[in-house]
């Protein structure tokens, strides 16, 4: 004996609804980052520097990593590289400095290179993005904003540690 059409449709609908409500698997932890080697112009160093410069004036916020919420130094760097090149960097300046990216001699800096500093500690505590002509963009301190500074400024020259190219 055949079941009436509404009786056949109801079990199919219930089955479809049950399949839609299945729990989604939780994402696992992010893998440890190893920086790809960037060849001049490949990732778009100009895009990186333009994006970084466009964020000048954004308020500093400790732990911040968005234009809307403000930036700290590593949040700014992470945002720019993620936004422009799809590269997800570690969260702190020290962790970013430890990625497998080549160190760059101070005299060979190119736009988009990362510059790292030590402030009264042995470990890296600050990072910025080199934009050319001896300048870099960074989020320096509470109460300030993202800004351009010169690497040859006495303070930054004294605290400069290393540069890396991603």
Labelled PLM ranges:
Residues 17-19:
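C-terminal motif of bacterial Sec signal peptides marking the signal peptidase cleavage site
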Residues 2, 21-40, 44, 103-105, ...:
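Aromatic- and glycine-rich peptidoglycan recognition patches
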Residues 26-74:
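Post-signal-peptide N-terminal segment of Sec-exported extracytoplasmic proteins
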Residues 36, 58-111:
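Catalytic cysteine-centered active-site loop
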Residues 51-59, 79-87, 118, 139, ...:
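Structured segments of extracytoplasmic/periplasmic soluble domains
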Residues 1-10:
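Bacterial N-terminal signal peptides that target proteins for export
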């Amino acid at each position: 004996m055949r079941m009436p059409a509404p009786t056949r449709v109801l079990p199919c609908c219930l089955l479809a609804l049950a399949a839609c409500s299945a729990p989604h698997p939780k994402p696992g932890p992010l893998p440890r980052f190893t920086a790809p080697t960037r060849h001049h112009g490949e990732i778009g160093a100009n895009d990186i520097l333009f994006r970084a410069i466009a964020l000048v004036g954004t308020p500093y916020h400790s732990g911040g990593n968005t234009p809307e919420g403000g930036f700290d130094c590593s949040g700014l760097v992470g945002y720019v590289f993620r936004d422009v090149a799809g590269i997800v960097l570690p969260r702190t300046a020290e962790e970013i400095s430890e990625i497998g990216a080549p160190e760059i001699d101070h005299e060979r800096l190119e736009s988009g290179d990362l510059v790292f500093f030590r402030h009264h500690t042995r470990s890296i505590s600050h990072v910025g993005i080199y934009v050319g002509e001896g300048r870099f963009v960074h989020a320096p301190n509470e109460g300030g904003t993202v800004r351009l500074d010169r690497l040859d400024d006495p303070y930054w020259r004294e605290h400069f540690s290393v540069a890396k190219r991603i």
